[in-house]
A protein has these predicted regions:
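Substrate-binding pocket helix/loop in short-chain dehydrogenase/reductase
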Residues: 98-99, 103-109
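Conserved NAD(P)H cofactor-binding loop of Rossmann-fold oxidoreductase domains
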Residues: 90-95
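Active-site-adjacent segment of SDR/Rossmann-fold oxidoreductases
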Residues: 147, 168-179
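Conserved glycine-rich cofactor-binding loop
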Residues: 8, 15-17
Length: 187
C-alpha cells in the first residue's frame, strides 16, 4: 500500500522534467495530481495520459513567475473544492552569465519564481495542512545551493534560499504532523 494513495498532490512546473516525472510516478502510486505550469497543451496531454491509466488529474494553467500568481492559483484550486495534502514546489529556472549581463526584469522574474512564489505557496497551504491534521511539502532546490557558483550567482543563491527555508519550516511545523523537505537534484 502506497502512502500516496488517495492523496491530493499539487505539483508546480508539472509540464516537463522533474515535475512531469513526479506526476507520472505519483499517479502510479495512487495519488490524485493537481498539475500547474505555463504550458497548457503539455499539461492537458499529461492529464489525459494520467486519466487514460485510470488516475485522477486536474489542470491549472498559471505563470508562477508573475507576482500574485501563487494566490491566484490557490484561489483557483479552492474554487474547485480541492484540498492539497502534499505541495511540491518544483517550478523554477536559472540563467547563466555574469550578474551585470542580466536586465533587472530577467533576474526579478527568476527570483519571483524560485523564491517568492515558492514561499507564498507554502504560506498559503501550511494553515490548510495544519487544519487537516498534517501534510507534506517538497521544495525542489538544487545541488547548486551548496556552494556559490560563478556565472550562476542569482540561481545558486535562490536555491540556497530554498534549502535554508525548507529546513527552517521543517523545524517549525514538525510537531504539527507536516513533513517538509528540500530535494536537491543535480551534480
Amino acid at each position: 500500500m502506497s502512502i500516496y494513495k488517495d492523496k491530493k498532490v499539487l505539483i508546480t512546473g508539472a509540464s516537463t522534467g522533474i515535475g512531469y516525472a513526479l506526476a507520472e510516478e505519483l499517479n502510479k502510486r495512487g495519488a490524485e495530481v493537481i498539475l500547474t505550469a505555463r504550458s497548457e497543451d503539455k499539461l492537458h496531454a499529461l492529464a489525459e495520459k494520467i486519466k487514460a491509466s485510470g488516475g485522477k488529474a486536474h489542470v491549472f494553467v498559471e505563470d508562477l513567475s508573475i507576482q500574485g500568481s501563487a494566490e491566484a492559483l490557490y484561489n483557483q484550486i479552492k474554487s474547485q473544492n480541492l484540498s492539497v495534502d502534499i505541495l511540491i514546489n518544483n517550478a523554477g529556472y536559472g540563467r547563466w552569465g555574469e550578474l551585470t549581463s542580466f536586465e533587472r526584469d530577467d533576474y526579478a522574474e527568476m527570483l519571483q519564481l524560485n523564491v517568492v512564489t515558492l514561499t507564498d505557496l507554502c504560506h498559503l497551504y501550511l494553515p490548510d495542512m495544519v487544519k487537516q491534521g498534517g501534510g507534506g511539502i517538497i521544495n525542489v532546490g538544487s545541488m547548486a545551493s551548496l556552494a556559490p557558483i560563478p556565472y550562476a550567482s542569482i540561481y545558486s543563491s535562490s536555491k540556497a534560499y530554498v534549502l535554508m527555508f525548507s529546513e527552517a519550516i521543517r523545524f517549525e511545523y514538525q510537531d504539527k504532523n507536516i513533513k517538509v523537505m528540500a530535494l536537491l537534484p543535480g551534480g
